[in-house]
Regions:
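HhH-family (HhH-GPD) DNA N-glycosylase catalytic core used in base-excision repair
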Residues: 1-186
Length: 186
């Protein structure tokens, strides 16, 4: 889950999913047993360690994110032991954030997915603070404003954010959408 969160850093969700799909298709193995066609198994840390830099580039993953993944897979065994600690918390966050390139947002995204932490809000997300602000008070807010709005739900802040995201509510749009640039051919 950490690897997926790293791939999602500073890019659109569409770009991250394309990168993940390409890497998983190339380095994952077919799922065992009866499984849908094309389903792949997440590669282990040893396989990720052997992915050459040009494959990351070909998948649209820049050098900073690829380097962060490489640092993470070097300590994969110790990170996997954090799963026994339960639903996140300071010890898990410190372990994740000890890896250069893993910050507050990546740590929160990882503890949400891998640890099932219901209270790790994604601080630093490009869209979420404004979405939460528009949904709860009718205007955009920054990270601090989002945390203030979510405070009554401490213990479940991440769940509230996901409920808002999945409710169908959409914040107002004021301009054109971001054009996704493809730098892989350069």
């Amino acid at each position: 889950m950490l690897l997926i969160a790293i791939l999602e850093q500073k890019v659109t969700g569409k770009q991250a999913r394309q990168s993940w799909r390409q890497l998983l298709w190339k380095y994952g193995e077919p799922a065992p047993g009866p499984a849908p066609e094309g389903m792949r198994v997440f590669p282990d840390a040893d396989i990720w360690r052997r992915v050459p830099s040009w494959e990351w580039h070909a998948a649209g993953v820049g050098p900073q994110r690829a380097d962060t993944v490489m640092r993470a897979v070097k300590v994969a065994a110790s990170l996997e032991r954090t799963l026994a600690l339960g639903r996140g918390g300071p010890t898990v966050e410190r372990a994740l954030r000890s890896i250069p390139g893993v910050g507050v947002w990546t740590s929160a995204e990882t503890t949400q997915r891998a640890h099932g932490d219901p209270d790790s809000p994604s601080v630093g997300d490009y869209h979420l603070p404004a979405l939460v602000g528009w949904a709860l008070i009718g205007k955009p807010v920054d990270d601090d404003g989002m945390l203030e709005l979510l405070e009554p739900w401490r213990g479940h802040r991440q769940r509230i954010m996901r409920l808002i995201e999945n409710s169908g509510f959409a914040k107002p749009r004021f301009g054109p959408r971001l054009t996704i640039e493809d730098h892989r051919g350069r």
